[in-house]
A protein has these predicted regions:
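Gly/Ser/Thr-rich phosphate-binding loop
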Residues: 148, 176-180, 189-241
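Glycine/threonine-rich flexible loop motifs
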Residues: 15-21, 97-98, 187-190
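Residue(s) in the substrate-gating loop at a strand-loop-helix junction
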Residues: 129
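Conserved S/T- and glycine-rich ATP-binding loop of Class I adenylate-forming
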Residues: 81, 87-90, 112, 124, ...
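Structural core segment of the AMP-binding/adenylate-forming
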Residues: 1-63, 182
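Conserved pre-ATP/AMP-binding loop-to-beta segment of ANL
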Residues: 41-43, 54-86, 93, 103, ...
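Conserved AMP-binding/adenylation subdomain of ANL enzymes
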Residues: 105-123, 133-177, 190-196
Length: 241
């Protein structure tokens, strides 16, 4: 109702350790309760978890992309909306935060080089959630503006499938720097305190670890430093302040 969205993009489901979350019933109920009605729902069918679509307002991602045509970039004014991101609601009703295009691009591109030392062609991984500001900023927009590769990972530090998941991703994609929450490393440390999974992978391209989003306890920082043998940088943003 607040954003007056025209199109809703979703998937048939998502995967959590040990369970599948069916998205379509949740989305259907939200549409039913909303006063504002969307024009279209575009749904990505997860393999083995396909759901029925109700034409003509619901269409599959594959159908849309198979008929897509190349279009030119659209020029916009620097103060136009890039997106509206809704807060988690920890202080009441979720509030829509508006980011403008010009200032956001300048700030994010600056941080990629000057905070994270990421250059064009590097591989960067922000192990966050796109629904959070870190994910929006550092999975989607900042890598795009900087011209580097971004890793999008569906899974957890442990349980998908094991405590070596992060090391495998870093090794497979030659990740230069990782930005994640201390909770992720606490979970890995709890499951594999001796770092046995770590020894199975080649992390020779990995240069730095950045932690934020909550307090990073000294024991976890020291454990990560000793295991990774790279700088572990505990920096903070609005949640911590």
């Amino acid at each position: 109702d607040d954003s007056k969205a025209k199109i809703l993009v979703t998937a048939s489901c998502g995967f959590e350790p040990g369970r599948t979350v069916e998205y379509k019933p949740l989305v259907d109920e939200a549409i039913k309760q909303a006063d504002h009605k969307i024009d279209k729902m575009i749904l990505f069918q997860r393999s083995g978890h396909e759901v029925k679509l109700n034409a003509p307002t619901e269409v599959s991602w594959d159908e849309v992309t198979s008929n897509a045509e190349k279009v030119d970039c659209v020029e916009m004014n620097s103060n136009e909306f890039a997106y509206i991101l809704y807060t988690s609601g920890t202080t009441g009703t979720p509030k829509g935060i508006v980011r403008d295009i010009g200032g956001h691009i300048v700030a994010l591109k600056w941080t990629m080089k000057n905070i994270y030392n990421i250059n064009e062609g590097d591989t960067w991984w922000s192990a966050s959630d796109i629904g959070w500001i870190v994910g929006h900023s550092y999975i989607v927009y900042a890598p795009l503006f900087k011209g580097c590769t971004t890793v999008l990972f569906e899974g957890k530090p442990v349980g998908t499938p094991d405590a070596g998941a992060f090391w495998k991703i870093i090794s497979d994609y030659k990740v230069k720097s990782l930005f994640t929450a201390p909770t992720a490393f606490r979970a890995i440390k709890k499951e594999d305190p001796e770092g046995k999974f770590f020894s199975k992978y080649d992390l020779s391209k990995f240069e730095s670890l950045f932690l934020a989003g909550e307090r990073a306890d000294p024991d976890t920082i020291k454990w990560a430093e000793n295991l990774l043998n790279v700088p572990v940088i505990d920096h903070w943003w609005q949640t911590e302040t």
